[in-house]
């Protein structure tokens, strides 16, 4: 399973290509990964602009101009890649987001997930913290808000292995 630093690296990688790009369409070759893919996802983001790319925990969030956010989770074996529009599709390329860069160049964001434990969904950006997968997440492991005092408070009454507490 991609760990948090790998998800952050993926987020930074796609951000270089996707920021301010226009989504042309979204294609899915399967109807479900971990869960059923919403059937309207194919149409809902056509001709929207990508305003921001974020990450909460292991979820990559693609905020768009239609006030909705695409939510991606890489699952156990998933990864993202950016290719030219005329790329050769591989067997496990399950989600393809066709987009136009600000330079006018057409590219694709490919979500490849061999084991199909990944996830794609969308939710209102203003209400994102209430999404069923995001609402119970704790403080982000890479957050600058984690201070010594906070960790001291958490660990002061624990008598278990430190790795278990951190995870």
Show the residue positions of the predicted features.
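Extended, highly charged segments
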Residues: 1-68, 88-89, 96-101
